[in-house]
């Protein structure tokens, strides 16, 4: 974390009913993460789930704390994890954040929804429906949108990053 950083919560095992909702952000995305959490509150919150704020080390602790306070209004549990060092650029930055969320989910033995700050839920029961749909799948399944690509840099079909990942996803990708 950045200069005004205080150490975040230690990664201790806890189990909370529901699913982990990982919201990743860097300093640039912080206002969008806050707006997303304010919108989730307007939709009625998702108290049965855990919010995992997954942030880049360059995010100021004061910013992370303010976003955590917003998350506490909608989620039953709020946790924060951070990269050890700032990671800039695409895809290195998002990939580093995803790895932090995947490590946390593995430690907790829970699946996680990777919800980027520009992925906006539309209905009050959005997370209940997603969690119920995922519960019907095998515990090691990935649940997300598949789409075709026309790039030589990617396989012909990829899954959108905004998806639900199994607890052991870090070892499956």
Segments (PLM) and residue ranges:
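Non-catalytic N-terminal targeting/anchoring module and adjacent flexible stem/linker
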Residues: 1-16
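Short loop->beta transition adjacent to catalytic acidic/histidine clusters or analogous donor-positioning motifs
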Residues: 17-20, 43-53, 76-78
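A conserved hydrophobic helix/loop-capping motif in glycosyltransferases and polysaccharide synthases
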Residues: 20-32, 56
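Short, well-formed alpha-helical segments that are part of the catalytic scaffolds
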Residues: 28-44, 62-66
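Alpha-helical elements of Rossmann-like donor-binding domains used by nucleotide-donor carbohydrate transfer enzymes
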Residues: 35-39, 66, 96-100, 125-133
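Active-site-proximal specificity loops/subdomain of glycosyltransferases
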Residues: 54-109
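Conserved catalytic core of nucleotide-sugar-dependent glycosyltransferases
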Residues: 91-94, 119-173
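Short beta-strand-to-loop acidic/aromatic patch adjacent to the donor-nucleotide binding site
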Residues: 109-120
């Amino acid at each position: 974390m950045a200069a005004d950083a205080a150490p975040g919560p230690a990664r201790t095992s806890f189990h909370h009913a529901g699913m982990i909702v990982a919201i990743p952000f860097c300093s640039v995305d912080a206002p969008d993460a806050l707006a997303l959490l304010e919108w989730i509150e307007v939709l009625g919150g998702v108290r049965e789930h855990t919010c995992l704020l997954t942030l880049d080390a360059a995010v100021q602790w004061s910013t992370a704390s303010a976003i955590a306070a917003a998350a506490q209004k909608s989620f039953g549990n709020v946790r924060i994890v951070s990269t050890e060092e700032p990671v800039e650029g695409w895809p290195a930055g998002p990939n580093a954040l995803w790895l932090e969320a995947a490590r946390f989910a593995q430690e907790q033995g829970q699946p996680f929804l990777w919800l980027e700050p520009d992925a906006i839920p539309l209905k009050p029961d959005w997370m209940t429906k997603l969690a119920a749909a995922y519960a019907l799948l095998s515990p090691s399944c990935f649940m997300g949108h598949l789409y075709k690509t026309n790039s030589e840099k990617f396989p012909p079909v990829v899954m959108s990053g905004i998806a639900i990942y199994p607890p052991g996803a870090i070892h499956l990708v």
